[in-house]
């Protein structure tokens, strides 16, 4: 018997050639250095388990009192986080979600009908393709280009706006490039959105991890907000707690548009009511304790970045996030697969993030320092590299 599945889920779900090569190498017992690990809970960081887990036992969570936006105490904790970033956020302008992925889903439903378009920077998350497919939204990439740093190609961005375009997505700072959106870039983005009647969606999950000259990155939550703007973040990166499943959307913009957006977002959130009570009650504690894990992560990432920069391998400029793009010597084949086979090092192919140049690969800066140093030593010593 055969069944019909939706066209929106018509992905190629077979194992990729690279994933198969990694699996087969591990099954064969090869000692691989994995430079793709991005889960902080398995990277040797010290979590205050008692402090982080004790609020989950709050008996008050046994009472069900749903609010589509999320518990007020949890939203107030998020608002205080933005106060730390010099931004004034009304708790009533926040909607809690189980993840930033869910937040994207809410916003695509809010802003788009089937077949509408959203502009997304490239390179960027591969996850966007799946999120858009599930909401019957079409993604149109606009390029970031590299010239002693990453920059937005505004001319190309505006050329790609069409009659069905509804929003521009900005990942600030961008993953994997680490490009942080500057004040002048923000002004140009807002001007383009105003000119074309578009919403601005800003993903700030890596905001607390600057690696460049600036000690702090400015949030898009800082006003003014001349256009309808949605700022997304969550505890996966802010507190290194991806397993706790907490994200949110903060809504800004002209009063009438903002009020309409919030009213509709509340209905969308009320339809799913996906947030659970224990996590919401624990959120203020997790937010208060975030500094300890952030310091550990930032120190690790900075040290690993320094190792990469001194390894002899070319590291493309990175201003933030937990990874780096390496530019290796050009070869005929797939660079990531060659490094796996010849050097026993696992890296992400640049194509995973939409990077067209075959010699570029992406490495996580989050892993244990000894493994990272050995991985870069192997890459630098691979034939063709200057190291």
Write out the residue ranges for each language-model feature.
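Helix C-cap/helix->beta junction micro-motif
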Residues: 28, 135, 195-196, 343
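N-terminal small-domain helix-loop-helix segment of the aminotransferase-like
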Residues: 2, 8-99, 106, 156, ...
